[in-house]
Amino acid sequence: MNEINVTLPDGSQRPLPAGASIFDLAASIGAGLAKAAIAGKIDGNLVDLNTPLADGARVEIVTEKSPEALEIIRHSTSHLMAQAVKALFPQAKVTIGPAIETGFYYDFDVDHPFTPEDLEKIEEKMRELAKADLKIERRELTSADAIALFKGMGEDYKVELIEDLGADKVSLYSQGDFVDLCRGPHLPKTSYIKAFKLTSIAGAYWRGDEKRAMLQRVYGTAFGDKKELEAYLARIEEAKKRDHRKLGRELDLFSFNDEVGAGLVIWHPKGAMLRTILEDFERKEHLKRGYDIVLGPQILKTELWQRSGHYENYRENMYFTTVDEQSYGVKPMNCLAHMMIYRSQLRSYRDLPLRYFELGTVHRHERAGVLHGLLRVRGFTQDDAHILCTPDQLDAEIKGVIQFVTEVMGIFGFEFEMELSTRPEKSIGSDDAWELATSALLNALKDSGRPYEINEGDGAFYGPKIDIKLRDALDRRWQCATIQCDFTLPERFDLTYVDADGEKKRPVMVHRVILGAIERFIGVLIEHFAGNFPTWLAPVQATIVTVTDNQIPYAQAAFDKLRAAGIRVQKDFRNEKLGFKIREAQLQKIPYMLVVGDKEVESGMLAPRFRDGKNLESMTPEQFITFIENEVKSYK
């Protein structure tokens, strides 16, 4: 055959010489497309640009503007970094280096920790290798030959990976004298890598196992052009200013203490107030929507965790204690007590749906290496609810939860994205049950009118789920809300209800959180608002500031009125300059400063100014109380 025909995305067919590659196809369409092309898709699968085409293939050309481009660019840049490290530190052993959401990383086994100066040298070497315009070439070897190759190179980690894969053949990529084990695809040449930056260094255990070697993980990022890279780096600098750990200290919200233990938050008065405001908000919103507030114990007998399956599947993340020779597990989740409440009496179909809500504090043994401020802790409180309903009610209940999420995220000013994760290969439950639950989740997503993605096979073994990721002011995604169908617990705990025909039936169960972990959500809020909380959330809503000591009696009376009305107010009557006191209140990000001078004392007024420096009209204490109450009611 001297000629082949391939199908383009628009359905048209294009003839090409036999043996033509995706690059040849791009060149046949136009010089501009050939220049922009970086990879391709054959029958929906991503492949390298120089991959030969078969007759009848459906082909799509991937350019720097394609959705898939960034991952390919970043993955190739991680290989470029590994090549640079091997050139500078020949004794280093390479492990893995994937593309991730914010860029890429590569883990190295080295004799000494990398320094910031090392990063600069590595980055400079990467630029040199990129300019060298090295071809990036793919080849396939038998696993035996690949193992022999990497053993000869002293790359023990690659040998382990190939042995664990258990495949007959593996693919390798080479550029210059550097060879790596990889599925690909990759860019055609190193010169296609134009805009990158190494950002940080961290430690990481090989394969996440604390018993294995500690490696040096180098993080970086890469983009299609320098403009995108510079914009990203500017966002990173802004994120550093907003870091909730930094602001948490500066605003005196919370702390951690090694004497207390890693991952255990100590809430200071202002932080505890912020948390209380959120929890009160949660209770009110749940009661409005027909949830019953419940509370469960912190420890439950180990036999119960064995029955639920947590002991078998989750015990490494649990804490256990023994009381009166009886083993107990500290709860990592709130669901079991809710099961006990349901089982405490006979249930009729007329009782359903039942919606149990608990602000439940749980503890999970997270590895020390993954702990990160409020975003990853060992003790936290979830806005956890479990809905038990009939199969016919499932659609409406899930739609109700999505509407709940939509309304709550709107109050906080967050946009969000949704993903449906479907049945994995290993799962329990009948086909009918999975179909019912997946259909209910999918119908709710469609009815929401919002875009969503489907992650095939990424559900839990006991049921499909919807994950909801909010977007903050820096356009970062945060996993918070989850809606999860569960077939396991109703079965294991023999939950039943009496149907209209008098028969016992199994209820459907939905686990769901709206904000998720309160600690994590507060961390996100701090960074989203940069500590400038809206008035309704601010731990301190106003501070009364005197000009001189002469105004203290009037200012104290005003302070007492505001506090009695429920306004979260503090006072600064120190003998300091007014500008100093105002600046300090601004640094504490307090929404309103109420200045009291001789004029205010004479007129019985307060002189409010917003934290951005804008002056408001003078108000009486009573008027200011009404003003704040209106802001709180409208969630401003």
From Swiss-Prot:
Where in the cell is the protein located? Cytoplasm
- Annotated spans, Catalytic: 243-534
Sorted alphabetically, the keyword list is: Aminoacyl-tRNA synthetase, ATP-binding, Cytoplasm, Ligase, Metal-binding, Nucleotide-binding, Protein biosynthesis, RNA-binding, tRNA-binding, Zinc
Q: Which domain of life is it from?
A: Bacteria
Residue ranges annotated as transmembrane are: none
Record-annotated TGS domain positions = 1-63
| Cofactor(s) demanded | Zn(2+)
Q: Which free-text remark accompanies the cofactor?
A: Binds 1 zinc ion per subunit.
**Is Magnesium a UniProt keyword of this protein?**
no
Chief localisation class: cytoplasm
Residues that coordinate or bind Zn(2+): C335, H386, H511
Describe the reaction catalysed, as an equation.
tRNA(Thr) + L-threonine + ATP = L-threonyl-tRNA(Thr) + AMP + diphosphate + H(+)
Stored SUPFAM superfamilies:
Class II aaRS ABD-related, Class II aaRS and biotin synthetases, TGS-like, ThrRS/AlaRS common domain
EC category name: ligase
Which Gene3D superfamilies does the record cross-reference, listed alphabetically?
A: 3.10.20.30, 3.30.54.20, Anticodon-binding domain, Bira Bifunctional Protein, Domain 2, Threonyl-trna Synthetase, Chain A, domain 2
Quote the EC number.
6.1.1.3
Annotated Gene Ontology MF terms?
ATP binding; metal ion binding; threonine-tRNA ligase activity; tRNA binding
Entry's CDD domains?
TGS_ThrRS, ThrRS_anticodon, ThrRS_core
Q: What GO biological process terms does the UniProt entry carry, in alphabetical order?
A: threonyl-tRNA aminoacylation
**PANTHER family of this UniProt entry?**
THREONINE--TRNA LIGASE, CHLOROPLASTIC_MITOCHONDRIAL 2 (PTHR11451:SF44), THREONINE-TRNA LIGASE (PTHR11451)
Instruction: Fill in the subunit field for this protein.
Output: Homodimer.
Q: Which family does it belong to?
A: Belongs to the class-II aminoacyl-tRNA synthetase family.
Q: What is this protein called?
A: Threonine--tRNA ligase
Query: Organism, per UniProt?
Result: Geobacter sp. (strain M21)
Gene coding for it: thrS
